Regions:
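A non-catalytic, amphipathic alpha-helix used as a structural packing/dimerization or gating element
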Residues: 41, 45, 80-83, 87, ...
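Non-globular sequence segments
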Residues: 100-162
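Structural preference for beta-strand elements that scaffold enzyme active sites
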Residues: 18-20, 51-53, 94-96, 170-171
Length: 181
């Protein structure tokens, strides 16, 4: 029987154990949805896990669906995530950034200029969403136009590139090869 606390090799990546910390939205980002020192400390304290999966990080301003979630679409956010990553690495941990766009699960209070959220279709979700003003009913999103897809894909690629540091490339490429085999 495999011990949960034994190392695990995935291609060229060695995890210190088989514990993976799942994504948890913390709502602790600062002004401009920038990861703060508190975010860095939170993840650093959990560096003993074999791998940390971060809270979901929106790829663009329109991708936010909760207040104070750290994005990966501005230079300040990228710098904030670098501090988080450096803190985890300094504590001997491994960390992977989860990228996302919430689609219709948002509210105009969380969108640039108070615009309606954008989603694949104009279907209003049931329920409520937390905003800085408190709980709000979901609204009907605006359907994404086909012509908008290339720009949205480009934003996702830019977010991936922002998260794809030299260190990440060194670790993720072997991991991707290991997963394929």
């Amino acid at each position: 029987m495999t011990d949960l606390f034994s190392p695990l090799r995935l291609g060229a990546i060695e995890l210190s154990n088989r514990v993976v910390m799942s994504s948890l939205t913390r709502n602790r980002a600062g002004e401009g949805n920038v990861p703060t020192e508190l975010v860095a400390e939170y993840y650093r304290q959990r560096a003993s896990a074999g791998l940390i999966l971060t809270e979901a990080s929106p790829i663009c301003a329109e991708g936010h669906g909760y207040p104070r979630t750290p994005g990966i679409h501005t230079a300040a956010q990228v710098a904030g995530w670098k501090k988080v990553t450096d803190a985890v690495h300094a504590a001997g941990g491994r960390i992977a950034l989860q990228l996302w766009h919430v689609g219709r699960i948002s509210h105009p209070d969380l969108q640039p200029g108070g615009a309606a959220p954008v989603a694949p279709s104009a279907l209003r979700p049931a329920g409520q969403v937390m905003t800085l003003k408190g709980m709000q009913e979901y609204v009907t999103p605006r359907a994404l136009e086909t012509a908008e897809l290339p720009a949205l894909v480009a934003r996702g690629i830019n977010a991936l590139r922002s998260a794809w540091t030299k260190t990440a490339r060194r670790h993720v490429r072997p991991f991707a090869r290991a997963v394929r085999t």
